[in-house]
Amino acid sequence: NDCPYSLANHWKNAAHLIGDTEKATKVEQALRAHRPEDAFQGAELEMLKYAYKLTIKPGDMQQQDVQNLRDFGLDDGQILEVNQIVGYFNYVNRLLNGLGVTTSGDTIGFYK
């Protein structure tokens, strides 16, 4: 959701945790191009679609968006967890952007 600070830190950590440079590059390219289907499928892809819509067009969310997650095997607890994580990051990213926080002088990522 267009937060350079969060993207820099969290992507570096995610790439490390993926543990495969080629796969990490494929995932990053797919996400930056807004084409998660190029790197994900099934429930993971459906969660990413849900996250994207909740981030970009929250007013357009419908019960069908939740049902789509159920159709891919997520239970209500898992759906709530996805919802809370997306909502939290949207909130925090808006705080960071609103305060003008940058990575200048920071060590990017947790892992060495």
Region spans (language model):
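Hydrophobic alpha-helical segments
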Residues: N1-K112
